[in-house]
């Protein structure tokens, strides 16, 4: 499913729509990985689940940073 790690600068370069789409893809992939783990007992790639979770967290963190930046800008004037 492509490269594993999304770098923060790659995420910041994405539009909000692209980030939401990527987040949706990652959540679907995480669900597939967890399902295969529950069926077979062992995931195909154990490190992949951890990396998917980290990528989801990176995207959510970037979204929150953007949200806080907009709030600060409106408070300043």
From Swiss-Prot:
This is Large ribosomal subunit protein uL29. The keyword Transport does not apply. GO terms for biological process: translation. InterPro entries: Ribosomal_uL29, Ribosomal_uL29_CS, Ribosomal_uL29_sf. Keywords: Ribonucleoprotein, Ribosomal protein. HAMAP family: Ribosomal_uL29 (MF_00374). It comes from Methanopyrus kandleri (strain AV19 / DSM 6324 / JCM 9639 / NBRC 100938). Belongs to the universal ribosomal protein uL29 family. One of its GO terms (molecular function) is structural constituent of ribosome. GO terms for cellular component: ribonucleoprotein complex; ribosome.
């Amino acid at each position: 499913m492509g490269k594993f790690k999304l770098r923060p600068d790659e995420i910041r370069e994405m539009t909000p729509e692209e980030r939401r789409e990527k987040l949706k893809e990652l959540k679907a992939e995480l669900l597939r990985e967890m399902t295969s783990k529950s069926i077979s007992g062992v995931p195909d790639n154990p490190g992949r689940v951890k990396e998917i979770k980290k990528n989801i967290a990176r995207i959510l963190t970037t979204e929150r940073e953007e949200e806080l930046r907009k709030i600060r800008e409106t408070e300043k004037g």
